[in-house]
Amino acid sequence: MALPKRRLSHARQGNRRAHVALSAPAVMECPQCNSPKLSHQACSVCGTYNGRTVVDVDAIAKKKADKSKGQQ
């Protein structure tokens, strides 16, 4: 089995890990309700995307409320 010939220095270790950092998500403002949303995603507050309503947020909220009420 192969073994490292020399100990890796901190500089080489850091250079290898230079590309491992996470980037912040691309957050933009919803033009409809001005809440923060992910780009290229429907708004989770008002349910619009590209100027159209694509998600019925009220129906989803009601469904969640009914589901949680039934589990009690």
Curated annotation (Swiss-Prot):
GO terms for cellular component: large ribosomal subunit. It comes from the Bacteria. GO terms for molecular function: structural constituent of ribosome. Pfam families: Ribosomal_L32p (PF01783). One of its GO terms (biological process) is translation. InterPro entries: Ribosomal_bL32, Ribosomal_bL32_bact, Ribosomal_zn-bd. Keywords: Ribonucleoprotein, Ribosomal protein. Belongs to the bacterial ribosomal protein bL32 family. This is Large ribosomal subunit protein bL32.
